[in-house]
């Protein structure tokens, strides 16, 4: 079994002080990586000898992959993010489905997400970088978010059928939406490349 490498989200610690001091504290605690930080923090993280596990590859959580009118923008943003990921040896980029909107069913939204991910997948495969679509809850924190169930996310991944397109499985969010976490993870582990962990309730 591959050892677990613990990473911490930048937003959890960012307010604790100056970036260099915060990064040092994270390293002293024993974390291997910092993730979800803004790119201007990347050099500080790497200079401290830490990894960057993942960062957000494109703009806008609510206005995401599930709208075709966003695809050109997101494609360009992901291409720029691939360059950053290569520069700083980041193995994964985070992607976001976007929120539900009138006139598009969840099935149609999945197909639209698969279209743009299929377009980007060959680049991800060539560069050896994962595209991880995050599962978020739509009941508490992100009302309307479309990728709010493991089944839906896996359906998108199966349509794309790329070894570099997978899910970011967020344990906090999926406990709110589904529960039965261990069984769900075991049954779908081939479609999961990254995990986020937090307790529920209370996070």
Q: Which residue ranges define each predicted feature?
A:
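Bacterial c-di-GMP phosphodiesterase catalytic domain signature
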Residues: 179-186, 190
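Short, flexible active-site loop motifs that bind/organize anionic cofactors or intermediates
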Residues: 12, 64, 103, 143, ...
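N-terminal pre-domain/capping segments
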Residues: 1-87, 158, 162, 178, ...
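Active-site acidic/histidine proton-transfer and metal-coordination neighborhood
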Residues: 40, 67-166, 176
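A short, flexible beta-alpha/helix-coil linker loop
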Residues: 59-62, 99-102, 137-139, 200-203
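Conserved beta-strand positions
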Residues: 31, 36, 95, 133, ...
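Histidine-bearing beta->alpha loop at or near hydrolase active sites
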Residues: 172-173, 202
């Amino acid at each position: 079994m591959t050892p677990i490498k613990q990473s911490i989200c930048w937003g959890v610690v960012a307010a604790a002080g100056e970036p260099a001091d915060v990064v040092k504290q994270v390293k002293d605690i024993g974390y291997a990586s910092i993730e979800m930080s803004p790119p201007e923090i990347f050099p500080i993280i790497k200079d401290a000898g830490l990894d960057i596990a993942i960062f957000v590859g494109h703009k806008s959580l609510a206005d995401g992959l599930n709208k075709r009118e966003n695809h050109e923008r997101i494609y360009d943003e992901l291409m720029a993010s691939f360059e950053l990921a290569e520069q700083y040896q980041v193995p994964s980029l985070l992607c976001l489905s976007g929120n539900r909107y009138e006139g598009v069913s969840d099935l149609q939204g999945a197909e639209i997400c698969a279209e743009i991910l299929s377009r980007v997948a060959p680049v991800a495969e060539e560069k050896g970088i994962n595209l991880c679509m995050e599962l978020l809850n739509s009941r508490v924190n992100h009302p309307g978010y479309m990728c709010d169930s493991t089944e839906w996310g896996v359906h998108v991944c199966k349509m794309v059928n790329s070894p570099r397109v997978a899910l970011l499985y967020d344990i906090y969010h999926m406990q709110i939406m589904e529960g039965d976490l261990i069984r769900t993870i075991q049954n779908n582990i081939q479609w999961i490349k990254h995990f986020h962990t937090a307790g529920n309730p209370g996070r």
